[in-house]
Amino acid sequence: MKKTALYAWHEAAGAKIIDFGGYLMPVQYSGIIAEHTCVRTSAGLFDVSHMGNFMVKGRGAKAFLQHMTSNDVDKLSDGQAQYTLLLYPEGGIVDDLIIYRIDADTWFMVVNASNMEKDYSWLQEHLGSFEGVQLENHTEELSLIALQGPRSMEILDRVFTGGECSGIKPFHFRTVPFNGREVIVAATGYTGERGVEISVPNDAATALWVALMEAGSADGIQPIGLGARDTLRLEMGYPLYGHEINRETSPIEARLKWVTRLDKGNFVGRESCVAVDINPQRTVVGFMMHERAIPRQGFTVYNRDRKPLGSVCSGTMSPTLKQPIGTADVPRGYMKSGTPLYLEVRGKFYKGEVVKLPFVNRA
């Protein structure tokens, strides 16, 4: 089992540690609800160093990424980031990821931990068609720290006191110095709050983590585990691989058409997406329960006549709303807000209804 560069800090802080994506990761510290609330009201610090980190380099790098990903990398300038997908030819999703354009010939990619080896092999498999492109895996060398919450940017400026990070726009990034090392500070995140994700060499990770914790102490900053990371992303309706998206899911039917640029030219999976887009059959919806029955992944979703419609993708008790919420894969005829849905839990049916995403409106 792998450990991140911050593992010793988590252990000393009394974190509950679990195996996630082959890494020993903190799932919670003080408790999921307290940590979730801290991010929504102040700021929290996440170790997400289990995520995969790739570099794509060379004069053919942009053309390679334009072919391999669903979004339009031609729209990016130096210092911009983009949410995108890797697709299979049949239109299913290999992974969702973020691409960062350092310059026209140098690109950084952050992929899901559980898909890292699969993604690397998938990209490697297609390199042969593009001259002068190198793919490098830097996952073992880099840590990824996320600072998220309404107080996050003020805390960041107390560490980077020269204004190096001031005014970073969403989905933009800067390369800045810290302790003699270069770090990438990107205005991205998985919580719906203001914040950044910082890619830092392992040997500087603990120093940066401690500096951010100290800088945020007056604001009540807390370390946040993967448990609260999941409830935060679900309140925003953000997809998680293996839940809302997978190999069988078309982005057209997963509320991800906005990152599937069918008009940009050919890319892997485009033809299949075009075919689905002509007549999509299903979609992912958000729903809220009227009773305190918490939806869980895999629960069957029914209509009012008790006809099975699909299944729950994700579900939890929302710490912000204090109501059970979830996402479900259903026929498109059931996507309108207010449409009733039913779950069967231990032989009893509970009513909910489709609601507009996100569940919680944030920054």
From Swiss-Prot:
One Gene Ontology term from the biological process aspect of the record: glycine decarboxylation via glycine cleavage system
GO molecular function list: aminomethyltransferase activity; transaminase activity
Catalyzed reactions: N(6)-[(R)-S(8)-aminomethyldihydrolipoyl]-L-lysyl-[protein] + (6S)-5,6,7,8-tetrahydrofolate = N(6)-[(R)-dihydrolipoyl]-L-lysyl-[protein] + (6R)-5,10-methylene-5,6,7,8-tetrahydrofolate + NH4(+)
InterPro entries, per the entry: GCS_T, GCS_T_bac, GCST_C, GCV_T_N, GcvT/YgfZ/DmdA, GcvT/YgfZ_C, TrmE/GcvT_dom1
EC number, as in UniProt: 2.1.2.10
Keyword terms, alphabetized: Aminotransferase, Transferase
GO cellular component, one term: glycine cleavage complex
Domain of life from the UniProt record: Bacteria
Enzyme class label: transferase
Function comment: The glycine cleavage system catalyzes the degradation of glycine.
The family this protein is said to belong to: Belongs to the GcvT family.
Record text on subunit structure and interactions: The glycine cleavage system is composed of four proteins: P, T, L and H.
Protein name: Aminomethyltransferase
Annotated organism of origin: Prosthecochloris aestuarii (strain DSM 271 / SK 413)
